[in-house]
Amino acid sequence: MEVLNAIGRRKTSVARVYLQSGKGSIVVNGLDFKTYFKTEPLQISVESPLNLVAEAGKYDINVNVQGGGVTGQAEAIRLGIARALVLVNSEFKSPLRKEGLMTRDSRMVERKKYGKRKARKRFQFSKR
């Protein structure tokens, strides 16, 4: 099987996922994903597309991810892996879509407005 690639995005994170048949290693920016993502919820999030379609341990996945924080990066990788699995077998699309793993989360950080402390929070108001 040749190398398949897919892109996942979340907030400002962009993950380029390269999937090929192998023993099941997931490498993120040159590190094992369990070293890169230290908390268990993030590790489970990254592995969830593979576990859902029972393909864990069948593919070697190499990921280049940049931008954002760890949660955004983990969710970008999750989307990229799900998209790559659909390229392998189109039958995976419906269970992945049903679990919401094929949908790009389009929520972005709202910009800060002038005259306010943050995007919506106002400066302290003094009545007297």
UniProtKB/Swiss-Prot annotation:
Gene3D superfamilies in the record: 3.30.230.10
Keywords: Ribonucleoprotein, Ribosomal protein
GO biological process, one term: translation
Keyword Lipid metabolism: no
MF GO annotations: RNA binding; structural constituent of ribosome
Xref: PROSITE patterns: RIBOSOMAL_S9
InterPro entries: Ribosomal_Su5_D2-typ_SF (IPR020568), Ribosomal_uS9 (IPR000754), Ribosomal_uS9_bac/plastid (IPR023035), Ribosomal_uS9_CS (IPR020574), Ribsml_uS5_D2-typ_fold_subgr (IPR014721)
A UniProt-annotated Pfam family: Ribosomal_S9
GO cellular component: cytosolic small ribosomal subunit
Keyword Ribosomal protein: yes
Superkingdom of origin organism: Bacteria
Family the UniProt entry places it in: Belongs to the universal ribosomal protein uS9 family.
The protein's name in its UniProt record: Small ribosomal subunit protein uS9
Source species of the chain: Cytophaga hutchinsonii (strain ATCC 33406 / DSM 1761 / CIP 103989 / NBRC 15051 / NCIMB 9469 / D465)
